[in-house]
Regions:
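Regulatory and interaction patches adjacent to catalytic/ligand-binding sites
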Residues: 1-202
Length: 202
């Protein structure tokens, strides 16, 4: 099955549920394919149609010996379209907001706690939770002076560890910082996200 839209990240199908139903004198197989998607921008969007290739029984059947065997035909099916409205995030987001929407926890580990002038420190962050880990950026250091050199963070997020909006996932960030003075402590950092359940920035 396939469903694409430039304004959404589509997480694919999972845990397909099947059952049967009878319509008239014909027995049909039903499949429910649940999924989730993450919006990239606000506004009204038309989602679909989704496309799916399925094998169906050949209604013409066969003649002679071939009638004893099941014949199938591959067909492309299209779903209906759905119009959805995505609300914009509230104004007043803190400067440390990096686009995360969901519920998250963060764990940080420095490569060393012995700080020396000019020695690099690698900060490893693990962000776990349910939400849009795919589009979330790294935590933000609360540094107001120029005595720290900060390098761009690297992000690691595999498809297997990504959150689908139902189950939690984990994203990893690694960032190098260098003190250019005799620092006594690693600078503080923040990960601010929007909690859609409480409708507030956390």
């Amino acid at each position: 099955a396939e469903l694409q839209h430039e304004s959404f990240i589509f997480k694919g199908f999972r845990n397909v549920r099947t059952d049967a139903s009878e319509i008239g004198n014909t027995l049909f197989s039903n499949a429910c394919l649940p999924s989730t998607f993450f919006a990239l921008k606000p506004g009204e969007h038309r989602l679909g149609p989704g496309m799916m290739a399925v094998r169906v029984l050949d209604s013409e059947g066969g003649r002679g010996l071939s009638a004893f065997f099941t014949r199938t035909t591959l067909k492309d099916l299209a779903t209906n379209t759905v119009t959805t409205t995505v609300k914009p995030l509230p104004e007043g987001a803190p400067a440390s907001f990096t686009g995360g929407v969901g519920v998250f926890l963060i764990n940080a580990k420095p490569s060393t706690t012995e700080l020396n002038i000019g020695d690099p420190i690698s900060m490893d962050f693990e962000v776990t939770g349910i939400g849009n880990l795919r589009t979330m950026a790294a935590p933000v250091f609360s540094i107001t002076d120029e005595n720290w050199k900060i390098f761009d963070p690297a992000k690691t997020l595999t498809d297997e560890e990504d959150s689908d909006g139902i189950e939690p996932g984990i994203a990893r960030f690694s960032q190098v910082i260098i003190p250019e003075f005799q620092a006594n402590a690693i600078p503080s950092f923040e990960l601010t996200y929007f909690n859609p359940i409480n409708a507030e920035y956390v």
